[in-house]
Curated annotation (Swiss-Prot):
PANTHER family for the chain: CDK-ACTIVATING KINASE ASSEMBLY FACTOR MAT1
PROSITE patterns to which the protein is assigned, alphabetical: ZF_RING_1, ZF_RING_2
Name of this chain's protein: RNA polymerase II transcription factor B subunit 3
One annotated Gene Ontology cellular component of this protein: transcription factor TFIIK complex
Function: Acts as a component of the general transcription and DNA repair factor IIH (TFIIH or factor B), which is essential for both basal and activated transcription, and is involved in nucleotide excision repair (NER) of damaged DNA. TFIIH as CTD kinase activity and DNA-dependent ATPase activity, and is essential for polymerase II transcription.
Zinc finger (RING-type): 23-68
UniProt keyword Nucleus, yes or no: yes
Cystine pairings recorded for this chain: none
A Pfam family of this chain: MAT1
UniProt gene name: TFB3
Length: 330
């Protein structure tokens, strides 16, 4: 039985070809042909080089050249393999196809997180069945029926996703340009500061030659340097204000505020963010001989041991959550 399993494993390995750099059809490899490109077809995901695809499928649909495969393939369906693992490649393609149909977002459920999670679980079930070939006919029919019944919703969600992507790209481009201008102004200011420092040194020496009051000379040179500063600093301040008040960020914020408040699941750890402690540590009125003894041991001192840390942790654990009313949080 073990030999049969081994034989089966060898057949599967030869089917998908363990040699990633050689075409299993024409035996062309990257060592002799560095520019060779390998393609796969979503029908069966068998790896074939580009030359074999052109030679076999140029005249129209043809059977897969792999002996164990009976799929009919078309040339326009071949694509470059992105992932080394064919299983991952197949799952990613299935997810793309399913998510193009089941493309609802949390907004479509009025921010009802529970309903949205059930929807996502249903989508994951479809992906799992298609990926593992479980009830493929029924699952494909379900996918097709949903697409026919929700064409308008699918198109609207695609348009919304497209607009969100465009806004994101515009924001990225805007911030990139602002940062570039900021760097240029910072270099200009740095160069001017260097020149002003050199000028100030020379000017102080020249003025001290005809004046005995060093403080007045230094103060006068400082005031002159302040007046000589160019408009680059004002431009830099303006860019910083623009970056802080990013119009794209404010747009996204306004969209977020217009949505309903999310139903955040209850967490018992809200107390860990309390800034005001509900207790004070009074070590003088509490004597713990065990803890006090540890303060004198070198192996504990070396690790940064402090008795107040111990008391602080114990009191934190005791008082944490006292201000949290579970009935109001759930």
């Amino acid at each position: 039985m073990s030999s049969a399993v081994a034989s089966k494993g060898m057949n599967q390995g030869s089917e998908f070809d363990d040699n990633k750099d050689m075409c299993p059809i024409c035996k062309t490899d990257r060592y002799l042909s560095p520019d060779v490109r390998f393609l796969v077809n979503p029908e069966c995901y068998h790896k074939i080089c580009e030359s074999c695809v052109d030679r076999i499928f140029s005249l129209g649909p043809a059977p897969c050249p792999y002996k164990s495969c009976d799929k009919i393939l078309r040339k326009n369906k071949f694509k470059t393999q992105i992932f080394d693992d064919v299983g991952v490649e197949k799952e990613v393609d299935i997810r793309k196809r399913v998510f193009n149909v089941f493309n609802k977002t949390l907004e479509d459920f009025d921010n009802d997180l529970e309903a949205y999670n059930k929807y996502l679980e249903e989508v994951e079930d479809i992906v799992y069945k298609l990926d593992n070939k479980i009830d493929v006919v029924e699952t494909e029919e379900k996918l097709r029926t949903y697409e026919e019944l929700n064409k308008q919703l699918i198109m609207n969600n695609m348009e919304r996703s497209k607009k969100d992507l465009e806004n994101f790209e515009q924001r990225q481009q805007f911030e990139k340009e602002m940062r570039m201008k900021k760097r240029m102004l910072e270099r200009q200011i740095e160069s001017e500061d260097k020149m002003n420092k050199e000028w100030a040194k020379r000017e102080i020496v020249n003025r001290l030659a005809s004046s005995t009051n060093a403080d007045d000379v230094i103060e006068g040179v400082k005031n002159t340097v302040k007046l000589k500063k160019s408009s680059a600093r004002r431009k830099l301040e303006e860019i910083n204000r623009v970056l802080q008040n990013n119009p794209y960020s404010s747009l996204m914020l306004s969209q977020g505020l217009s949505r309903k408040e999310d139903n955040v699941p209850f967490t018992p750890f809200n107390g860990d963010r309390d800034l005001d402690k509900r207790y004070t540590i009074d070590q003088e009125s509490y004597d713990d001989p065990f803890i006090k003894d540890l303060e004198n041991r070198k192996d504990y001192i070396a690790s940064g041991f402090r008795s107040d840390f111990v008391y602080d942790r114990m009191l934190t654990e005791a008082f944490m959550g006292l201000g949290c009313v579970v009935a109001e949080e759930v």
